[in-house]
Amino acid sequence: MTELQSALLLRRQLAELNKNPVEGFSAGLIDDNDLYRWEVLIIGPPDTLYEGGVFKAHLTFPKDYPLRPPKMKFITEIWHPNVDKNGDVCISILHEPGEDKYGYEKPEERWLPIHTVETIMISVISMLADPNGDSPANVDAAKEWREDRNGEFKRKVARCVRKSQETAFE
């Protein structure tokens, strides 16, 4: 896949998302001159602790996309087992294709070139609704989610939701 083909694919995916928006998120370019850096706004899924939140994140695509996955980083603070303290998202769909050297993931759970921005975002929204506590990026959040989901974990998420609402459109 050439860089030109990659750029055309990203342009097509962005146009499709603008033409046919998907419930739960919106996407656009950070800089109109750079197809490889996107900003997404994710609406906290209904009936979850994240409901009502408006979380900003960045997707950074490699020049050989879709052969390799983008990186995703929350810009808005979020307390979640699968998001590290720097905001980096850790879910299977964003892991490099192939075998997992640690044996936690099957190859088909990892990045495949058939994935799109839409499938990535649906996976992230699903992750918000149902964290994977077995392979956390934020061990402290995972421990609280397992041991005190309706206590300290819920309080920290509620604080992040409030903060996201206050800063969503800055």
Curated annotation (Swiss-Prot):
Modified residues (N-acetylthreonine): 2
Tissues where this protein is expressed: Widely expressed, mainly in skeletal muscle.
PTM statement from Swiss-Prot or TrEMBL: Autoubiquitinated in vitro.
EC number: 2.3.2.23
GO MF terms held by the record: ATP binding; ubiquitin conjugating enzyme activity; ubiquitin protein ligase binding; ubiquitin-protein transferase activity
GO biological process: proteasome-mediated ubiquitin-dependent protein catabolic process; protein K48-linked ubiquitination; protein K63-linked ubiquitination; protein polyubiquitination; ubiquitin-dependent protein catabolic process
Name of a matching Pfam family: UQ_con
Entry-linked PROSITE patterns: UBC_1, UBC_2
Signal peptide stretch: none
PTM annotation (N-acetylmethionine): residues: 1
Membrane spanning stretches: none
Enzyme class name: transferase
Positions annotated as active site in the UniProt record: 90
Catalytic activity field: S-ubiquitinyl-[E1 ubiquitin-activating enzyme]-L-cysteine + [E2 ubiquitin-conjugating enzyme]-L-cysteine = [E1 ubiquitin-activating enzyme]-L-cysteine + S-ubiquitinyl-[E2 ubiquitin-conjugating enzyme]-L-cysteine
Family: Belongs to the ubiquitin-conjugating enzyme family.
Protein name according to UniProt: Ubiquitin-conjugating enzyme E2 G1
Source species taxonomy: Eukaryota, Metazoa, Chordata, Craniata, Vertebrata
Gene designation: UBE2G1
